[in-house]
Every structure is written in structure tokens, then in C-alpha cells.
Amino acid sequence: MWHLLVWIILLATAQQMITEGCPAGCQCNTPQTVFCLARKNSNFPRSVPPDTLNLYVFENGISSIEESSFIGLNGLHLLDLSHNQLSSLPGGVFRNLANLSNLDLTSNQLTEISADTFQGLSRLERLYLNGNRIRSIHPEAFKGIESLLELKLSNNQLVTPPAFSLPHLLLLDLSYNAIPVIQQGVFNAGNIESLRLAGLGLKEVPEELLSGLKNLHELDLSDNQLDKVPPGLHGLTKLNIAGNVGFSQIQVDDLSNLPALQELDLSGLSLQTLPKGLFRSSKRLRAVSLAQNPFNCVCSLGWLSEWMRVSGVVLLRPDETRCHFPPKNAGKTLRQLRDSEYGCPAPTTIQMPSTMPPSTTTGPPTTTKHLQTEAPTTASTTTTTIPHQEQEEDTQPFQFDFEDTLCPPQTCLNGGSCHLDPTGQLECECPPGFQGTYCETGPVTPAVVTEMYIEQVKIIEVTVSSIRVDLQSYSQNKEKLRAIRLTVRNLYGADRRPMIYKLPPTLPEYTVRALSSNSSYWVCLGSQGEGGPEEDLCTETHTLGEPPKHSPQVTQSQEGNLTLVLVPAVAAGILLSAAVAAAACYARRRKGKGHSVEDGGPLEMDGVKKGLDGKGEVKKLSEDPTGPEKTGAESEEPLMDSTRIGNNNDAPTGRLPHSYF
């Protein structure tokens, strides 16, 4: 009876293993998380374990989903369907996912959002729809998902956005749509902290448009058509107005209401100078970007270098922050420019014209030629005398031919040609393979790493056989991120081939398993966006030295996943059957030995046991005519002759071979 109970337990365990198996082509190495990344199957994965909380179906080529796709997944918290080919979503397709809090539909082919698309998602907090072809959104599309915290709609084809009546919304991204005018009342979400309106074609941002956003901290207005800082901005910690090429002047008062400002991006504008004291009100400023502006590096801009040295503010993209004019400074970076190169006068008294207060410096009295001047118009009646020869030399530099000296050869780098554009601005025409305002960027120039954000790969946890890597801190500041590339390589082991993982950008962390203990690994993170792969950030880490106490877990299932589950179960069943059979055999033999002691068999009655040896002769096994008579226990014979138990070659070994089970 006891072996029957064992069989029942074994079958129940096998059934549980089958039920909780990983879908074909997916990875299930993290509890309650399924990764189906770049799977070679355009159908939605089947047999997803019902206790799954996080399901990543990233870049699978899926073109359609149905409500039945999510049957049994009521506990799902995160669903990543990004980088597929979904062109439409049936109404109520997600209604059974009442516990879903994160839905990522980035980079599909969706064209519209209906009123019931997100029906039933009352707990949804993050909805990512960026990178689609959405032209219209029903006014009631977001009704019923008032718990939403983040909504991303960038890189679509929206012309008129709906009213966002989402009381808990913290982040709204509408960047790179065709919305040249935003009507008042669109932002009915008073708790928004981060608003991204880049690349919409905005010519102005009325003060009343943002007046209701009292908690606004981050504002992105880059790549629009603005010519001034929008009025009425308060409480911002991050302001980005880069890429507004019509923006040619900035005033001190433009930043006077932003004392909490920490990051400011003024790159890609048409600024030729910055007024002294521009950042006086921004006491908390940590980083500023001034790249790709046509700066006129003369005395009026000389204060900037000194301010950067003493303030400690980081200049972002320093190699792209260069002088445009005058010719002697053209192409030089502001960071390398010396104070004396701004052309400011030396701190000594210099001679001035006669209409100004008299100078205390005069020429040598023995060689001076006096010039008669008109009486000064001021109260002073002193006539200044200066050497005529020196006057001609001092004024000569200001009498150059403007057209001949505006575009000297050294202005454009790497063989670029200089000329004036229709607006009178200096412009460089770069040779093939070079780019930038001054042709300073070559074809193999590595990407400039921002000084402020020299990131390191963050390792969350290291064990004897695994490394858990933080992905969120890497991806949070990167725009248009298509995928994260994680590379892990053993530095000193026998197998130093890199292991490369392509992961979705929404994944907060990832655990690399089945690593060698007490080994050094090189861990790198890279990103793949619209601009191609970026330079990796790497770090070295070391797994712990203690050997793992448990067998490594099978992390990936292939098409034969069911077979891999059944084989161990069948093997265990065979082993159990063998054990039961051995026990039964042993019991029968014990019983047989008892009978032989009491009665004895026919051969034993005669004192002989017939058996064939190698020569076919009959041997006596139990009786020795010359020995003393044996009775009781002394007459027992062994069940097996140890001299006849051996391997497949019949060589005597004296013991049974090991079982393969």
C-alpha cells in the first residue's frame, strides 16, 4: 500500500511540473516572470504559468492578440508587448487583467485608440504607446484608468490631443507629434511633474497653458520654433529648450523665477552671447548645455569661463561648445579658451579720445607730435595729447575689411569651406564624412560622454552563480531607447566568449545565472536606439567563492520542453518500481530460506545442487562427505555466489554494478 501512495505523490508532482512549465522559446529563470524575447514565433505564447506576474513578449513579430490570449492570467502585473506588429487592439482585449499595473505597447503599428481599448484596467499605472502611428484617440479612451501615473504618446501622428483628465498623472510625453497649437484645458491633470512637448512645432507657449500645473518640475520644449523662454515658469528643476533655432537672445529676467533650476539645456540655439549674471538666480544649478551655438567669443562673453571655474557647474557636451567669432577664436572650445583670448583690455589705464576724461598716460615728451582737438563737451577742459604714430597703430585693427576677414580658412575645420547664409550667419560646408557647426566631428569620432553622467553599471546582488544587474538606472535618462544590450564575459575562465542578452528597455533588472563561482566577470550595458548602438558602460564584478549548494535551475525551454519534464518523472517511476520489486524479491527469498531450513528442497535432501559450470559438469554445493554434519543455520547457502557476480565481461568483481538511476 505504501508504494501505491508514493506513486500517487510522484504523479501529482509530475502534473505540477507540466502545469508550471515554461512556454516554448521563453525563459523562466526568475520567479513568476516569463521572458519571451525575439522568439521565432509570431503567435502569442501558450501555456503561460497562471502565477506569472511579469510577462515580456518583446520583439516577437506578433500581429494580433485576442481576449482569450490572457485567460488564466488574472494576476498579471506587467505586460510588455513592445516592438511587435500590432495594428489594432480589439475592444476590451485586456478586460480580464484587472491587476495589471504596467502595459507597454511601444513601437507597434497602432493607428487609433478606441473608447473601450483599456476597459477593465482600473489599476493601470503606466501606459506606454510611444513609437506607433496613432492619429486619433477617443475622448473617453482614458476613462476608467484614473490611477495612471505615466502616459507616453511620443513619436505618433497626433494632431489634436484629447483632454487628459487624469488626477494622479505625474508624467506626460507628447513629443514629436504634429501638434503646432495646444488648446487651453488639455492639461487637466494638476499633479503633472514632468511634461515633454518636444518637436511639436510650437511657436509659443501661452502662460495660461501651464498655469494650472503647480507641481511641474521638468519641462521639455526642445526642437520647436520658440524665440524666447515661455513666461510664467515657476518651480522648475529641469528646463530643456534646445534646438529652437530661432532663439537668438536670452535675458537675465528669463531665468529670474527659477531659483530651483538644476539642469538647463540651451544647446542648438542661435545665441552669440550670454548676458553677465544670467545664472545669478539659479543657485542650485548643477549642469548646463550650451553646445552648438554660434558664440562670439569677445570680451562681453569673457565672464562665462570664470563663472564655470568658480561655480562648479558642469558644462555638458564641452567638445561641441565652440567659438564662432572672431576669426582668431573660431573653432576653439570655450573650455580651452584663456581669459586673455577674449580680447578684454588689460587692467591698466589707457588713452582715450579728447572728449573723454584725460588719461594719466602720455607719450615720450621728446618725440610727441601734438594734435589740436576741439574743446570737450563735458565740464573738463583738459586737452589730451597722444603720439600720432601710436594713434594710427591703435586704431588700425578696427579698420579691417569685414568681408575679407569674416571667413578665414581656420574657421571651418577638417577642410570645410566657410560662407555666409542668407541671414548673415557664418556657416561651414563640411567635406564628406564630417559634420558639426565647424566640421569638428569626424566619421570615427567616439560619442562624447557627458561629464555629469559618467555612469557605471550598477550591480544589485552577486552570489556564487549569479549576477543581478540594475537596468532602470541605465535606461531612465535615455530617449528613443529600442533595447538594452547586456554583455557578460568571464575574464579569466576557460570559456571567455561573451554572453549577450537583448532586453526590453522597461525591464528594471535582470539576473544572469549559471555562472562559475569565484570568477571575475566583465559586465557591460549598451543601448540600441534610432541612432544605432551606443558606447557600452562596463564594470567588473566577482562571484562569491562558496560553491553553490543547489543544482542549477533549468532556465530555458525549447520546443521539446514537455519531453524534458516527463523524462525525469518516468525515470523516477522506474527507479521506484525497481525498489518495490527488489523489496518484494527480498521478502520472497527470506520466506524461501525459512522453508529450506525446516523442510529442505529435493536437491538439498540428496545433499547436492545441480548446476552447470563452464564445462557442463555437475557440482556439489551444499554437502561435503568428509566434513562434519551441518544443521540449522549452518546449512544455509548464500543467495548469490560472489565469485559469479561481475561485469559484462564475466570477470569476477565481488559486488553489483552501480545503477544508472
From Swiss-Prot:
Residues 455-543 form the Fibronectin type-III domain. The keyword Membrane applies. Residues 606-623 have a biased composition (Basic and acidic residues). Residues 293-346 form the LRRCT domain. Disulfide bonds join 407-418, 412-428, 430-439. InterPro entries: Cys-rich_flank_reg_C, EGF-like_dom, Leu-rich_rpt, Leu-rich_rpt_typical-subtyp, LRR_dom_sf, LRR_TM_domain-containing. Residues 348-395, 591-661 are annotated as: Disordered. Residues 348-385 have a biased composition (Low complexity). It is a single-pass type I membrane protein. One of its GO terms (cellular component) is membrane. The keyword Cell inner membrane does not apply. It comes from the Eukaryota. LRR repeats lie at residues 52-72, 75-96, 99-120, 123-144, 147-168, 169-189, 191-212, 215-237, 238-258, 259-281. Keywords: Disulfide bond, EGF-like domain, Glycoprotein, Leucine-rich repeat, Membrane, Repeat, Signal, Transmembrane, Transmembrane helix. Gene3D superfamilies: Laminin (2.10.25.10), Ribonuclease Inhibitor (3.80.10.10). The chain crosses the membrane at residues 564-584. It is found in: Membrane. SMART domains: EGF, LRR_SD22, LRR_TYP, LRRCT. Residues 1-19 form the signal peptide. Residues 403-440 form the EGF-like domain. May act as an inhibitor of TGF-beta signaling. This is Vasorin. It comes from Xenopus tropicalis (Western clawed frog). The gene is vasn.
